[in-house]
Amino acid sequence: MSQSETDALPNVHVRAEVLVQALPHMQRYDEEIVVIKYGGHAMGDRAAAEDFAEDVVLLEQSGLKPVIVHGGGPQIGRMLDRLGIKSEFREGLRVTDAATVEVVEMVLAGSINKQIVGWISAEGGKAIGLCGKDGNMVQARRATRTVVDPDSNLEREVDLGLVGEPERVNRAVLDAVLKAELIPVLAPVAVGSDGQTYNVNADTFAGAIAGALRAKRLLLLTDVPGVLDKNKKLIPELSVEDCRRLVADGTITGGMIPKIETCIYAIEQGVEAVVILDGKVPHAVLLELFTDYGAGTLIRRSAP
């Protein structure tokens, strides 16, 4: 054995230990559906994107059934700027008029969706890109948001334009794709009963998909480590009741609130557990599913 091979042995032993640790986790998830929401910001780093695609292929080859839902907010914003279309946000959601929804569909269901399919294909996976309009997979209704005016303390409804909320998921479309041993890559664009195209928040879309599929896990990849306490430290595990309490006491605020609402909805629809984790961490998905340490904040119906 050469000196270089001898020097490499400790690293090989570490990798072997990792594989041994991963085996029971792989067996636990065998043939189980895992829905992964892949955020727009996490896609900005090419190396991280390739790592993500590699992880997805490894999940599929390990016996899991990964379903990918992607966002694309930053990419949409850049395209709107290039086209001279002004972006407006109300209550954290993009106000979507007729011109904007065309751009949203073009960016999400077109360039981003096919880019992710290409990354997975490059790693040896078989992926298919779809959006909620394909096969009438996700029907949506116009979203409504009610806010309290801080001056009058009266409620008022916020008009978000062509922003939709999932109303019905046609599971048969997804079942057919999974039966064909393909990895679905889904853009959060849905259709109304009248044929209108709707822009759907990617977290909300992923929650609806996971609920319809009764997924084993829903992973929400974000730009933060998970749910943080008031001292900005990661909370490793929460129950649904804990989540509601932390929202009520102001620990969970801002953009994390709709993510928590998605988690609660998915769990109430039959998803076993949801994890909010940092998509910028290398191989975060594998760390969560295949190691004893996990990653991010695990949310389940009740405390273990």
UniProtKB/Swiss-Prot annotation:
Residue positions binding substrate? 72-73, 94, 199
| EC number of the protein | 2.7.2.8
**What does the entry list under GO cellular component?**
cytoplasm
**Gene3D superfamilies, sorted:** Acetylglutamate kinase-like (3.40.1160.10)
Pathway in which the depicted protein is active:
Amino-acid biosynthesis; L-arginine biosynthesis; N(2)-acetyl-L-ornithine from L-glutamate: step 2/4
Q: Where is this site: Transition state stabilizer?
A: 37, 259
Tell me if Transferase is a UniProt keyword of this record: yes
MF terms (GO), sorted A to Z = acetylglutamate kinase activity; ATP binding
Entry annotated with the keyword Nucleotide-binding: yes
The chemistry this enzyme catalyses reads: N-acetyl-L-glutamate + ATP = N-acetyl-L-glutamyl 5-phosphate + ADP
The entry's function note states:
Catalyzes the ATP-dependent phosphorylation of N-acetyl-L-glutamate.
Q: Please state what the protein is called.
A: Acetylglutamate kinase
UniProt organism field: Methylobacterium sp. (strain 4-46)
Supply the source organism's classification: Bacteria, Pseudomonadati, Pseudomonadota, Alphaproteobacteria, Hyphomicrobiales
